[in-house]
């Protein structure tokens, strides 16, 4: 398994060298990759300003129908779109294996693909809810601890988790027909992945791809696990409203709080030395998701383990990111920028390997 990892990383290094030489030879690295030079950037800023003006004026119907052009404008840039799609596909393959999908004709596969598509669409109501809450409740990003937490819990966590869960709801009747907690959780997780995919396009667009490795091991699985747990609770509530209704509300509230605390701990300066709270929230959500996964998966012998699939996906994204950044910034700059990320993300990889159903580590 580790030979596979090193082989993939070696291919990525050679790919980065090739990208660097093509860049040096005048391959036009920044024609389509650099965000600052993207054609139509000014038009996008004008669209955002018009949208904000509509929201300030309370024209919410116009805001709703104008949102897609703004929310999905970065998708037109092919390079960050391709990198974000590649990362999303790697995690989606992991989810399909975790859900024990048996083939192309398996209904579980199509439920999860539908969930991914609904997650992509959830970016639309997310922006709408966020803009509405900010104006309705007077939410503003703040450097102060209490106001900062309030903004990220109510203004970020609530609209994002609410929109993802709302887009999961249309799939519940199909899940009740198929029946199964495992596929319900993994379909909801796919909704989270779809959201993360669209969100990642914007982040990669603005960072020349430097955030790809970090977000592959943080944002992607965080959205996946948050929505997976909330969706599983909602599915159980739909199946047994009296028994699971209150618990579904509790789980949703906890996911919103965990999301908000994680973001606030990263951004709000007042957290200071207590910023570790965000990583604790992340670890607890991931732990609970994989605990459910271990309990729900039926024992089976697989030619490729989930751990191997995870390591392969992580290695492939690292290799692709290295080549991408080498094309953008040059080989040496890619080495300098990504070396620290690889070391810091090794702890995240350890966390996932430890929680896998067929765990490779025990400490």
Where are these regions (language model features)?
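Hydrophobic alpha-helical segments at protein termini of multi-pass membrane proteins
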Residues: 1-363
